[in-house]
């Protein structure tokens, strides 16, 4: 017989278990079955499965003793969200655990709590803490809250793609907002990959390790899970072992509900496994501490309005917003390191508090990581393979799964289908549909439940979500619920269908299982409440990814879909007014009117919203107001899909630009490799090609939009198959495209056959840019078959950095000999060498050739090429512009070239010889050209060591009455103040020289003042003088300012 104390404990424990409902008792048993506390004394599931409350109490006491059974029961009560039983149990005589009254900082929905007995054997401080962190974070509750689904974090976690940025995104955006970067996403052109292990390591830009790392990610990107994984890996000895002695996790979500003052000591104590610990030892080395501040964007708005006096002492008690603000501003414990996670909407506020943080962005799952996640989620390999095969056949949804939250939702829904024995059904195409799919799947009849389960007081649910969103509030108490007609019973019912989740640490607080679900319901509120709610949401949003309403507005557009509207009405009884669509269309029309029919600022955000609608008429009407559409820094395959999908409906658009970012296909910005070389990066390029449907959409756009005359695709990984599909549209009779740019689009030589057919069939196409593609000589030969065809009307072709070698000269010469329409040819960055140039010149000298502009920059040309070019200039009277920059021509080469330039039949107007290793000797020949050539108007000699002597020689030509030069570049030519005497003389005589560029020359104050004196003369015709890069005193600057007043049309740059 048991002792009386044990009998009392057994009886009391059974009364607690009797208070559990049937579902809760089953959950209790399942958690008990996976509890590591039991070690070898786990109770066999066969004995627990049918046991009632009394039998369960007897089994627990028999297996582990009365007190241990109580401690484990209390821990399990927390896990099944019975905080009332846990709190009451603390008063039992057999349980002597002092409750922790400090701040609760561990997020309730993500970590399975494990209490540490105060009587546990005393260990080293760090070892004790690591044990606790390991137990705290090694298990996580699945958000779907199915009975017993507490999974191992390490088994579920899948590595995310992280990139670091090389400059502050806010500064970057401000600097370039008026130039070409209209969206914060464009900062990605200056990113590079980074691993979690090196977040706090120095790099080429930071010789010292960063003290603050900001980890940014959109909704559902896995910020909190990554933060939890950092905690677990540190505790397991896999991360930051030589860097941080202690890592503490602070949940901003939980901080919001704290209204008491606390100190850093209280903050750390609340993270510690037991109370009363002295933190003096920890504070001896604050540089060895890391604070993870998770969810900065979830902080209540009052935090951002917090004012000093700030907290300066770690023992000083202050309101939480002051304490955290002091920590982030580095006024408190400036030596500690911080890892802060946030959504984009809070970045500007956060960066206003920080100095030189390392900025890292989560881009989600790569394609391989998505596959890995599915196998981790489904323990059954067969199920995982089946689901993966299904999703691979439905590419848009698989692409959307780059967002971890979407991957989880999709896996949860498909797992439910598999477990119910159903065939995998057609799945949704948009984010809105994915969330609706999940919501309705939760309300499907479960075993033993006969009917579809609709949550009570649906209107109250969506109004609660909306009010929380407007006030940026994510935790709700019973008073909040009552305000919207909800009570505990309503919420408990909804918990059963897994939309709400009750906080583990605080009985009175409720929250949606993920912020994105709150945003989904808030969108429903706007759709159901008509014009005013929609107008307010759109006005505050403004199509900015940094706005806290971004995802809500995306969902709002998705709910406008007619099929979605009918679905809501049929299953939930919700009716969306047609006025909502009218309001949205009117708002877009106003946006077009205010931006001059150009969609650039917020373009990707708007297209993403329209993609959610999935209705041709609506999208076409919305985009009919834009003649120019420019989308920059498209960073994922899904974003590419969104853009191409909407491009089909841009029926009024004349110019369409789609620019991918450096990581839009998961590849670095490397130069192209020689064709035929199958390296690892070549394999990666093939693996990361955009799906065929992307090119098919664009093909449809070019053949259905008769207004479209310019299509620019930059960093769009089309590949050969993508080009083949696009060319189908280009060959269509209704295609009116004139300008096609396919720069850095992973095009190989094999695709040139399709391009050749397109330039033959499409007589409207006059400009083609294939720069930065691995075309090679074989590809060029295929392309040239089309370029020299009699039907080809191409006038300009750019082939920069296309791996064209000497043999390419023969094919190009053949084109020039047959195509009289081609007037511009850009071969920059191709190693043609002298032999290739010799072949090219055969075509240039052909009587059919009408080429006017030729770029030969960085083509590995030398002196021999100058001789061939000289003979060409004597015969070709159509060539007006020649760029030979960055070729090792030398003085001797230019002197040979001048023989052709001096010929009476030479009509060249623009010559660029920058960085050609020229000295003063070359100026002799150039001066002689200026004395006889009346056609030459622009001359660039920048970055050549001409010196003052060179300018003196050049001046003889510039002062000659025959010289008609209008623009002269002499940047970085080694000129001094002595050269200004010759320059002044030239400006006093020349009546045609209008622009003079002298940047980065040491003219000095004396020389510049001499020039100013000449410029004041009314006979001086100069209109542009650039003097940047010179150390001039204030007096000289005042003289130039006075000169601008005298001649307001004069552009003086300094």
Swiss-Prot record:
- Phenotype on deletion? NLRP12-deficient mice exhibit attenuated inflammatory responses due to significantly reduced capacity of dendritic cells to migrate to draining lymph nodes. They also gained significantly more weight and a greater percentage of body fat than wild-type mice. NLRP12-deficient mice also exhibit enhanced disease in a mouse model of multiple sclerosis. During viral infection, augments host response with greater type I interferon production and RIGI protein.
Pfam families per the UniProt record, alphabetical: FISNA, LRR_6, NACHT, NLRC4_HD2, NOD2_WH, PYRIN
Its domain of life? Answer: Eukaryota
Q: Where does the Pyrin domain lie?
A: 1-95
Which residues are the signal sequence here? none
| Family the UniProt entry places it in | Belongs to the NLRP family.
What is this protein's name?
NACHT, LRR and PYD domains-containing protein 12
Q: What is the lineage of its organism?
A: Eukaryota, Metazoa, Chordata, Craniata, Vertebrata
